[in-house]
């Protein structure tokens, strides 16, 4: 590898698709890959921009907003959480807007999952993440980290000190839900994957669906950091729903 890693050729090649890139998706959406472990997605509606997922920290989302501003000056008017893993940078939207007067949509299980994994099972998960995300591997040499599947790293070193900036959802739902957000029709469908509160977010007018279920890697059915088993039969239900949408962008 580029830093002297000895690894399978396919593992090394996978790093290329994780390179930091701000992709345009059609005419009304962007997806920022490689900024952290997760992506940040932005959707343009008639009334402004919808931000989907805000990353691991304030600094991560702030960098995503800087990239967005290279493409549009339209204001962010709403936020959506696809699941509870990447909801800790929302304060960056507040900083940019100068207020917190915007709706945040998400599954009603997000708050409980944040409490559970931040509290009662948090220490076990934190220890397990050291193994799962290769945190102790060197940066160079035979045994250096190549990537961690969904991202180049667990946290982007450029985002230290990783300031927490979660803001709870203001509009929650526990089942299929429809709303008009930023002037666009949005259809939410629960689709448990690596989180029980994952949802597929369908924008029929844009022929686009944002999801946390169709991954570019072998799906992690049993995270070694110590989470519960992720039943692939439930996963298949969500994948079937996504396929049935027949959207151009997903």
Where are these regions (language model features)?
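Hydrophobic or amphipathic alpha-helical targeting/insertion segments
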Residues: 78-134
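Short, solvent-exposed loop/turn and secondary-structure capping segments
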Residues: 43, 62, 90-92, 114-119, ...
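N-terminal pre-domain segments of enzymes
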Residues: 1-19
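Metallo-beta-lactamase
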Residues: 24, 48-50, 56-58, 113-191, 234-238, 243, ...
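Active-site metal-binding loops of divalent metal-dependent hydrolases
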Residues: 54-55, 83-84, 109, 213-214
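Active-site metal-binding motif and surrounding structural segment of the metallo-beta-lactamase
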Residues: 17, 22, 47-48, 58-103, ...
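Conserved beta-strand hairpin/beta-sheet module of binuclear metal-dependent hydrolase folds
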Residues: 18-72, 200-203, 207-213
């Amino acid at each position: 590898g580029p830093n002297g890693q000895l690894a399978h050729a396919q593992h090394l090649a996978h790093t290329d698709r994780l390179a930091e890139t701000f992709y345009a998706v059609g005419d009304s959406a962007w997806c920022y890959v490689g900024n952290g472990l997760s992506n940040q997605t932005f959707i343009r509606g008639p009334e402004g921009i919808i931000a989907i997922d805000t990353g691991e920290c304030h600094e991560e989302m702030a960098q995503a907003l800087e990239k967005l501003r290279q493409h549009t000056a339209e204001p962010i008017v709403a936020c959506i959480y696809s699941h509870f893993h990447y909801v800790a940078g929302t304060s960056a939207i507040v900083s940019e807007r100068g207020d917190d007067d915007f709706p945040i949509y998400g599954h009603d299980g997000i708050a409980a999952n944040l409490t559970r994994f931040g509290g009662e099972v948090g220490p076990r998960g934190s220890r397990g993440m050291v193994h799962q995300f290769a945190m102790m591997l060197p940066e160079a040499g035979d045994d250096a980290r190549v990537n961690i599947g969904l991202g180049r790293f667990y946290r982007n070193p450029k985002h230290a000190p990783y300031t927490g900036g979660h803001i709870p959802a203001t509009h929650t739902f526990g089942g299929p839900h429809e709303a008009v957000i930023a002037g666009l029709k949005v259809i939410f469908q629960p689709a448990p994957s690596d989180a029980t509160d994952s949802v597929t977010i369908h924008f029929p007018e844009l022929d686009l669906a944002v999801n946390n279920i169709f991954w570019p890697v072998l799906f992690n059915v049993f995270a070694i950091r110590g989470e519960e088993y992720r039943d692939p039969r439930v996963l298949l239900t969500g994948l079937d729903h996504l396929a049935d949408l027949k959207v151009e962008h997903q």
